[in-house]
Amino acid sequence: MKIRGFESSMMGKDIDFIPPAMTRLCCLNEISHALAGVMAVEKAYNITVPNEGQYLREIARLGEIVEVDAIKLREFKNTDDLADIGNKIKSVLGKKAKYLAVGGVLENISDKRKEKLINLAKEGLNLVDKDFVKLVDERKAKIPLPDVELIDAYNFDANKVETNGLPKTALYDGKVVYSGSLARMYKEGLINSKNLWDVLSSRMIEIEFCLNKIIELLNKLKLTHPYMEPIIKDGKAIGEAVIEGGEGIVYHKVELLGREILDYTILTSENFNKAVLDSVDNDEAKRIIQLCERCYYL
């Protein structure tokens, strides 16, 4: 099923084409798209990834979230240094995730780099603005915006998605829903309001949350081999993966014949968030959500 158009370029390709292709799909979600694609293949063939590989992948994913949250806050605050820190952390998978592969991660980091990344994450924690949420609440009181329904990858059922138009907007269970930092931080219990203004607060809160998780995961690394050669079976197989990426939900579905890609489906948070913007039709809402045009239109 082709929701966006980019999927058609994947037909007939080998599964090794997924990471390099997906990292070029969107500069804000290069890890997320590549990871979701690789995980979909792993689901199709029940491939197990070593713990070390899982830790590295999660560190990169969280680093990308830090980067994207910081970039999306630039309209309201100087967060360039935080964006740079997130970018450096996500590079644990190499430039353009070149070490990401079906079966894990091809190369681990050194002990020296591990310590540098821990210090980098700690530096990021010192840059988190604890007063930012208060400033958002003040603006919320002056300029009212509606509450939104939320959807996250942890309670996601692809069968409940309805897509309309071309490029496609998406509803979930017949509702307009927001996917992204607010949904994630609401689920974590770190924010208790669903107002559109809270998207800004949730991004700053999430940066701190992710940096703490990154330090925790880096300390778990034993620097052993993070990759196991996968066994790709003959015959047809279907795999799906949904993760929380830099923007929000990233869903990939692959239909395979051995190593060959027969069909590919991609759905992103921006398919949902475009429906939110269409329903609100407000300039402030556009500044807050900052729809990723590339993820939506390509």
Curated annotation (Swiss-Prot):
GO terms for molecular function: nickel cation binding. Disulfide bonds: none annotated. InterPro entries: Ni-dep_hyd_lsu, NiFe-Hase_large. It holds the Pfam family NiFeSe_Hases. This is Uncharacterized protein MJ0727.
